[in-house]
């Protein structure tokens, strides 16, 4: 099965409506790079939550403002990866999402 992947790219995401229209008209699943794009019509994403990333980055900035030396601070990564599925978008693109995958999803948009 073919699919279209839209990464977290401002140029492409700004034209997401057009990409969704093409994917729907051609019945090609649209997999996206982040949850907001799933809400905008993508079928699914498995990735980070940018709000949580911003919070974590803000906490690190507070440490620096309170005197921590950035050169000695440990590198941090966001461990919380989320599976988000849009069942309406999947249906419009001719995709049947297996129930076991829906059961594993952190968020299902209906």
Where are these regions (language model features)?
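Short hydrophobic alpha-helices and adjacent helix-cap/hinge residues
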Residues: 1-110
